[in-house]
Design a protein with these regions (language model features):
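Structural preference for solvent-exposed beta-strand-turn elements
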Residues: 1-369
Length: 369
């Protein structure tokens, strides 16, 4: 095998597929990038048995062939090559010579026949949406994905695909994020996609106006965008019936300026550490929102005026980080909080009431038992 490829193009492709590679893989060959040169193209693949990323780039193929090269070494060497073409050549001794300009490296090549094939997913064409829309939907929800492996279904995002709409849901037992958009789709399927897959998709997807094609069935999902194909196994298990936990009623409705609220919470959070944690004690009344917190580091009292409030005054405890995340990831100027009492989940929505819903569970104060 021997081929030549422009350095920047090759380095970008190596970086893209490396996102699917685990440093300490159970199978050593999976720490490498599978490369196949034929015709006028080079196909690169990274795979960890759960997620695979593939891309094809143009190159000058002098001798067709395939090999597997250590991903970390290959990336470091190609990135440090001078500008211009990079040549990779496999010799009969199983060594790969990587050269560019006057620089030359030689590293062991792994046997391509040992590299496991990506599964034939059989995934059906589901929908094509704009990258900008899907990116926004994922970014506004993925922060709420559970980190607890005891509930595997909640370590991913639920995609509810229905004729005409896409809903994405994430939760971790303390908060819930839901976002919905209208799409052109005739399928009806619910799938749970691992958070890691979606995080890597965000890094690889094209620009806001580019398309991302989604193919799915009950076992796999495949995303195609920006010259890359990402294949992922789905998470099996039952996702919480999220619709049943959304409060229907409200006793208190408060509209707040997000920046003002965030600044106030950040000041109160100065006395909170990983070791010294106490909930924020927030009182919502007609003319002001009061934020208090006390830990062994000190105590804070801060307040600001809400934009609008209707209903009963209420005092409620919040985990500072969960409330901050909801406000920050909303990317809204104003948010509406709907509260049904000090121990009920708090619903947060954009001021116009559309697009997405966040739920944050309150924290009991210790003296309330």
């Amino acid at each position: 095998m021997k081929f030549e490829c422009e350095k920047t193009l090759l380095a970008s492709a190596i970086d893209g597929v490396s996102r699917a590679i685990t440093n300490r893989a159970a199978i050593p060959v999976l720490e490498g990038i599978y490369m196949k040169a034929e015709g006028f193209n080079l196909t690169l693949t990274g795979y960890d048995m759960e997620m695979g990323i593939t891309t094809t780039i143009e190159c000058n193929v002098l001798v067709p062939g395939e090999t597997v090269l250590d991903a970390k070494l290959l990336s470091a060497m190609v990135n440090r090559m001078p500008a211009g073409d990079v040549c990779i050549e496999l010799n009969d001794e199983g060594q790969a010579k990587i050269s560019g300009g006057v620089a030359e490296f030689e590293i062991p090549a792994l046997n391509a026949s040992d590299y496991p094939s990506l599964p034939v997913t059989g995934a059906d064409n589901t929908m094509t949406v704009k990258c900008g829309m899907l990116r926004e939907m994922i970014e506004k929800t993925i922060y709420a994905v559970s980190q607890d492996d005891k509930k595997p279904a909640h370590t991913g995002e639920l995609f509810v695909i229905e004729p005409g709409s896409l809903t994405i849901v994430a939760l971790d037992g303390y908060r819930l994020a839901i976002i919905q958009r209208d799409v052109e789709c005739t399928r009806d399927i619910r799938i749970i996609i691992p958070a890691k897959t979606l995080q890597e998709l965000l890094k690889i997807m094209g620009g806001a106006d580019d398309d991302v094609k989604i193919d799915a069935n009950r076992r796999y999902v495949v995303f195609t965008s920006n010259g890359y194909t990402i294949m992922s196994r789905l998470i099996e298990g039952d996702f919480l019936n999220y619709e049943s936990v959304i409060p229907k009623d409200k006793k208190t409705r408060i509209t707040v300026d997000c920046k003002t609220f965030i600044d106030t919470i950040e000041r109160a959070s100065l006395v909170i550490t990983e070791r010294l944690k106490n909930p924020l004690r927030i009182t919502f009344s007609e003319d002001k929102v009061t934020v208090r917190c006390q830990t062994p580091l000190g105590k804070v009292l801060d307040e600001f005026a809400p934009v609008e409030m209707t209903g009963d005054p209420v005092e409620i405890g919040f985990n500072n980080r969960y409330l901050l995340d909801a406000l920050r990831y909303s990317k809204c100027e104003r948010m509406v909080l709907k509260i049904n009492g000090p121990l009920s989940p708090v619903k947060l929505l954009p001021e116009d009431g559309k697009d997405f819903i966040y739920l944050v569970l309150p924290v009991r104060f210790k003296n309330e038992g």
